[in-house]
Amino acid sequence: MTRADKAARLPATFMATKTIIKPKQSPAAVGPYNHAVRVGDLLFCAGQIPIDPKDGNLIAGDIKAQTGRVLQNVKAILDDQGLTFANVVKSTVFLTDLANFAGMNEIYAQYFTENFPARSTIQVAGLPKGAGVEIEVVAHF
């Protein structure tokens, strides 16, 4: 099979142009990455931590406050592209302590209210800037 034959069999998503998304309402990135990249009808959002977009600082507070700020940061990216949490098809939650799962889940359920995305939750040794939670999502246009 030639390369052209293989390309013809790929879904359009994999042949689409990569577009960098830089939402105006998002906090500055804390490293060499973009907050979101669109490829075809998919939007890949980088992991968001509880940074206040106004001052670039990690917010103070418990896991519920941190999760709320994280999801507000995710919402800013989705809003920028005309999407909502209903468009999210996959999320990955990173927690520094799985004992915080219930608190995170309580706030998460306020944003994802129906047609839930697939989700993974992973405990990690640490997150940037000392955050307790980070969430990344993939959304569909």
Q: Language-model features: where?
A:
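Short, low-complexity intrinsically disordered segments enriched in A/P/G/S/L with frequent Arg
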Residues: A8-L10
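Short, polar/acidic, helix-capping and beta-turn segments at strand->helix junctions
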Residues: F14-F141
